[in-house]
């Protein structure tokens, strides 16, 4: 009589108890602080929600970078007294002319000092400046990565929505927000760059002339809305005296007239700059601009050294909260364009879950009937192992908070068949040994040993495919790969460990004369 391996018994009990504890939140409310509380995280197609594919407008970012670089070059050329003319930004490059060939060498030295990765193409007295290919790729990756983080902060400022954000291709971002019933809100907060800047108002400019297109050099015309919803224009200095990147907090509030405002505070550097601006420009107006639209242009009555203030405007409570959220999250490095939009209602997700349950239940019952009909008691053991495999899958999905999608349910159903396939392979090998006239114990041991290598090879091959699907796939394909991987691991454990243990217990304590396979 063989001895049962104690490590198998111990391992099986521990894994099963642990799986029950992890899977419990899917069936009932767990109040104990010592037990897991997370149920399976349902994907967009099961829970409903919003699906957006965003395009990062890298060309706009690059053009703005070139404009900033052009301003830096002008400043350095003036300081070093280098003569130039016709310095313009065109097609993501800077073009200029030097007045004499002798000025090319010091000009190149300045350019290399500012940014060594700028490529200078010289044609007689004309120079074209552009970024190298490697620098462009680095900038693109940086902009997309920053955009993903800022989108995450805007969409999930409270940390409860669990959005899915993935980079697709070179400059696309996939955003999925399960349970989001208001996609227009998402589009609104993502459609704004939220670049907050402070400018001094050009008090000497003629508004009427500026509206006609005659804007003074170094200034620009911005439009705002008055409390009566009438448009008005203000000419402001192009120079940004303070940026929104120095903000630390922003929140909706009310002024003394019970009007909605946005209260803000700067960091130490921002507070110092803000204090100097208000101290040196008392009596002048300071324009607060968001995405080139004027929010307000209050008159500076005196030095503000506390580093805080309010933004007034034609705000509702909702719009003030929205602006505060955008300012807290930070400005996007580049505008985002929505190139694909899908909205899935909760009822459709519920229908998908119900369909998945029916398909899984029908498949499970069909497999159980087939196994009992084909292999008798051993088929029953395979069904028990299959049930435990499903429990392990549910527990692992809950434990790791892997997102379960409709293709993921298909992956689980697929692993049900694979789990039983492993048992079928083992039982057929046992049957072959029994035909040779060997004992039950020898047939069982040899059947498991000879089938193990085949089962391992086939499952490893499938795991490699699942791994590749996860690496190169997106969205639902990743969900399928995750469910398939968890299913394969669970089914292998149940087929090789659980089934073998159940058969060993049956053979040892019930001593059957026949295994029911011949």
Curated annotation (Swiss-Prot):
**One GO term of the biological process aspect:** intracellular protein transmembrane transport
Q: Which UniProt keywords apply?
A: Cell inner membrane, Cell membrane, Membrane, Protein transport, Translocation, Transmembrane, Transmembrane helix, Transport
Gene3D superfamilies from the xrefs? 3.30.1360.200, 3.30.70.3400, Multidrug efflux transporter AcrB transmembrane domain (1.20.1640.10)
Where in the cell does this protein reside?
Cell inner membrane
Q: Which GO terms describe its molecular function?
A: protein-transporting ATPase activity
Membrane spanning segments where? 9-29, 361-381, 384-404, 406-426, 452-474, 486-506
What cellular component GO annotations does this protein have? plasma membrane
Its membrane topology is listed as: Multi-pass membrane protein
- Kindly indicate whether the keyword Transport belongs to this entry: yes
Q: How is the subunit organization of this protein annotated in UniProt?
A: Forms a complex with SecF. Part of the essential Sec protein translocation apparatus which comprises SecA, SecYEG and auxiliary proteins SecDF-YajC and YidC.
Similarity comment text for this entry = Belongs to the SecD/SecF family. SecD subfamily.
The record's section on PANTHER family has: PROTEIN TRANSLOCASE SUBUNIT SECD, PROTEIN-EXPORT MEMBRANE PROTEIN SEC
Q: State the function annotated in the UniProt record.
A: Part of the Sec protein translocase complex. Interacts with the SecYEG preprotein conducting channel. SecDF uses the proton motive force (PMF) to complete protein translocation after the ATP-dependent function of SecA.
HAMAP family listed in its UniProt record: SecD_B
Q: What is this protein called?
A: Protein translocase subunit SecD
Species name: Rickettsia felis (strain ATCC VR-1525 / URRWXCal2)
